[in-house]
Amino acid sequence: KSDKRLTKIIFKFKNIKLHSNIIIISVHQLPFMHAITTKLDVVSCVSPLFFFERWQMLFTFIEVYRHFGLDRQSIYVSSVLTNIMRILQQYEKHGYIELVPWTMLTKEDRDDRIDPNSEMSWRNQETAMNECLFKYKESASFILFIDIDEILIPTTNSYFNDFQLLTQSTNIASFAFQKLYLKTPTSEYLFMKFFRTNRITQ
């Protein structure tokens, strides 16, 4: 049973006011975004970049997905190096990627022990992926939810063709992919050498 001395709710036709002698309630207006309606074959939703500095991984990631026909790469950004951001903005300017600012939650309370970000899993990754899903689900035929260190190589040289082949079987519940871990020391990394030495096999 609620105590009417603590909180009183007054209903009106146009607004609702909350009155309390104990708790101050802040009301924030949530931004409203329209869903993308442009028809796209394949879109990727990339987990938020946080304190990101590994440019070798990032630009290899973007170029490989571009090469195999990804229509749009929606990259969520919390924080990256300034020079990396400048290059990303050039990619966005030419329509290759979409940059989505993704800020950490602010602490409304002055108590430093209370941090809402500590209650979020993987820097609020799930919320970013859900936003991307609702933004593109009416537009894209296929949506990839991926991290910046994950590169999917299609067998037909086209993501869209691969996914279409997979969906022809209506009695399959899930798919498994061969997974390889590759790592090159940053001091030995050459961007052009990466593309010259990699070969795609069936």
Where are these regions (language model features)?
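Acidic ATP/Mg2+-coordinating residue in the GHKL
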Residues: 77-78
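Short, acidic, metal-binding catalytic loop of nucleotide-sugar glycosyltransferases
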Residues: 61-72
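Catalytic-site signature of metal-activated, phosphate-bearing donor transferases
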Residues: 1-31, 39, 122, 126-130, ...
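Active-site-proximal specificity loops/subdomain of glycosyltransferases
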Residues: 32-43, 50, 81-145, 154-156
